[in-house]
Amino acid sequence: MKDKHSDLVSNRRATHDYEILETFETGIVLQGTEIKSIRDHGATLQDAYVKVIHNELWLIGCNIAHYRFGNIHNHEEKRDRKLLMHKREIKKCKGAIQEKGLALIPLALYLKQGRIKVRIAIAKGKKSFDKRADLKERDDKRQMQQALKQQQY
């Protein structure tokens, strides 16, 4: 059976650079060629972030490549895109990012019932020693798994 929410595009650096505190699902306002390009995995969330402007959420810095079969009415690659969310959730996000050290970052773009959704997160930036500790922990876990596997044979 196919996964309901398989990610079309994911921000793989997010979990390395940030500590994820809470995630939300949002809709996104897109043009037709943008949707087709995202379905072809033609988008990146590398330098993207979410900003609250006039009590609305905006995805800034998301690069969606031109649709290769598009015509002269193709979309602009690096435009700001509006995110759709309930007002109480927007207020919660706005309050969280006003707190020192917290940010709103996009984690993934995925399909849900034929519509493209954005998974965003309230996150706290990691310091370099936190990143090193995470890498060491992951390395230790991997070595333990390999040792257990060797013991079984």
Swiss-Prot record:
<feature type="region of interest" description="Disordered">
    <location>
        <begin position="133"/>
        <end position="153"/>
    </location>
</feature>
<dbReference type="InterPro" id="IPR020081">
    <property type="entry name" value="SsrA-bd_prot_CS"/>
</dbReference>
<dbReference type="Pfam" id="PF01668">
    <property type="entry name" value="SmpB"/>
</dbReference>
<comment type="similarity">
    <text>Belongs to the SmpB family.</text>
</comment>
<feature type="compositionally biased region" description="Low complexity">
    <location>
        <begin position="144"/>
        <end position="153"/>
    </location>
</feature>
<dbReference type="GO" id="GO:0070929">
    <property type="term" value="P:trans-translation"/>
</dbReference>
<comment type="function">
    <text>Required for rescue of stalled ribosomes mediated by trans-translation. Binds to transfer-messenger RNA (tmRNA), required for stable association of tmRNA with ribosomes. tmRNA and SmpB together mimic tRNA shape, replacing the anticodon stem-loop with SmpB. tmRNA is encoded by the ssrA gene; the 2 termini fold to resemble tRNA(Ala) and it encodes a 'tag peptide', a short internal open reading frame. During trans-translation Ala-aminoacylated tmRNA acts like a tRNA, entering the A-site of stalled ribosomes, displacing the stalled mRNA.</text>
</comment>
<dbReference type="GO" id="GO:0003723">
    <property type="term" value="F:RNA binding"/>
</dbReference>
<keyword id="KW-0694">RNA-binding</keyword>
<keyword id="KW-0963">Cytoplasm</keyword>
<protein>
    <recommendedName>
        <fullName>SsrA-binding protein</fullName>
    </recommendedName>
</protein>
<dbReference type="InterPro" id="IPR000037">
    <property type="entry name" value="SsrA-bd_prot"/>
</dbReference>
<feature type="compositionally biased region" description="Basic and acidic residues">
    <location>
        <begin position="133"/>
        <end position="143"/>
    </location>
</feature>
<dbReference type="InterPro" id="IPR023620">
    <property type="entry name" value="SmpB"/>
</dbReference>
<dbReference type="GO" id="GO:0005829">
    <property type="term" value="C:cytosol"/>
</dbReference>
